[in-house]
Each structure stands twice: as C-alpha cells, then as structure tokens.
Curated annotation (Swiss-Prot):
Its cofactor is [4Fe-4S] cluster. InterPro entries: Fe/S_biogenesis_protein_NfuA (IPR017726), FeS_biogenesis (IPR000361), FSCA_dom_sf (IPR034904), HesB-like_dom_sf (IPR035903), NIF_FeS_clus_asmbl_NifU_C (IPR001075). This is Fe/S biogenesis protein NfuA. It comes from Pseudomonas fluorescens (strain SBW25). Belongs to the NfuA family. The lineage of its organism: Bacteria, Pseudomonadati, Pseudomonadota, Gammaproteobacteria, Pseudomonadales. The gene is nfuA. [4Fe-4S] cluster binds at residues 152, 155.
Length: 194
C-alpha cells in the first residue's frame, strides 16, 4: 500500500477539475519522471478509464481513484498532495521528500540502494567538479553499470574515481554487489574536469 497523502482540500480541488472533464470514471495518475535522480519531477495527470496500468496501485478516494505508478511508488513514500487557497485563487502542491532519493533499508532492492548512495554520498562530491554518475542497470552477475556525466565524462581521473571511490563505497554498503562497470564514452572531453 502506498504512503501518499491527498489532503481533503486537494481531493476537493481535484474532484472539481475531474468533474469538468465530462468523462465518467476519470481519475488521476501520480508518477515521478526520472525518479531517484536529481532531475526527479513529481506529476499528476488525468487518467481516463483504461489508461491506468495493470501494475499501478489504485487508491480509492471519496470522489475518484488515484492511480500510483508502480515504479514511482517507493519514491512517493511520505508524499503529500495539498491545495492552499490564496488571493490569486489557489495552488496545488506536491511534496515528495523521497522523489530524488527514496528511503532505503537492507531489504530495499539493490538498484534503489545504489541510487541512494549515488545521490547522498557520491554525487555530492562529484558535483564539486561539475560531474555526476548515474545507474544504468544492475546486471545478473551483481555488477552495477554506471555512466558518468558533466565534468566526469572524459576526465582522466574517472577510472580512479570509479575504482577507489565509487566502487569501494558501494561494495562496503551493499554486500551483494560484486563490482561496477563504466559505460561512459570518455572520448568526449569538452567538459572534462581533468
């Protein structure tokens, strides 16, 4: 079950918007684009009957159904959708404190734990050089496939950073991980730090 909260004020505002769509059974779909990254954006969209996905979690509310995207669900933990009135009318707000970095524990999937450590421990250090690293995949043999960007792409020290910094940190924190692999095209050097 998802831990997203839709306040009464937000519910009433959304119910009013949905009633104006003249589509019986229309609801909303809540999702995050690029979850677990610094570029994460929380979104709410209309969801006509049949547009929901089988893996979505259906949250039955008083006047409509909110469909929570399965892939985004962990990142929507503790999220609050609210509506506040002001002199200009009002504003719908979505606060999702885990959109960029979800809460993780030892039972969380490996990819979520990798993203957590990339965002909280590794990327803040790389940001001082204008760089970042992102998880592309975890292959079956326990290898994290990573890609550098920004000042790290093409940097002469990227392999040292990968082995002595990133790999060491991830292996210490995630015992079932066996190693890391870089798939960055380091021939592109125009933004490289070194």
């Amino acid at each position: 079950m998802t831990a997203i909260t839709i306040t009464d004020a937000a519910h009433d505002y959304l119910a009013d918007l949905l009633s104006k769509q003249n589509t019986p059974g229309i609801g909303i779909r809540v999702f995050i684009t690029q979850p677990g990254t610094q570029y994460a954006e929380t979104c709410i969209a209309y969801c006509k009957p049949g547009e929901e996905k089988p893996e979505d979690t259906a949250l039955g509310l008083k006047s409509f159904t909110a469909y929570i995207d399965a892939f985004s669900e962990a990142f929507l933990d503790d999220a609050v959708v609210d509506y506040a009135t002001d002199r200009m009318g009002g504003q719908l707000t979505i606060k999702a404190p885990n959109a960029k970095v979800p809460n993780v524990n030892a039972d969380s999937p490996v990819n979520e734990r990798i993203n957590y450590y990339l965002q909280t421990e590794i990327n803040p250090g790389l940001a001082s050089h204008g760089g970042q690293v992102s998880l592309i995949d975890v292959v079956d043999d326990g290898i994290a496939v990573l890609k550098f960007g920004g000042g790290c792409q093409g940097c002469g020290q990227a392999d040292v950073t990968l082995r002595e910094g990133i790999e060491r940190t991830l292996l210490e924190r995630i015992p079932e991980l066996k190693g890391v692999r870089d798939v960055t095209d380091h021939t592109q050097k125009e933004n490289a730090y070194y």
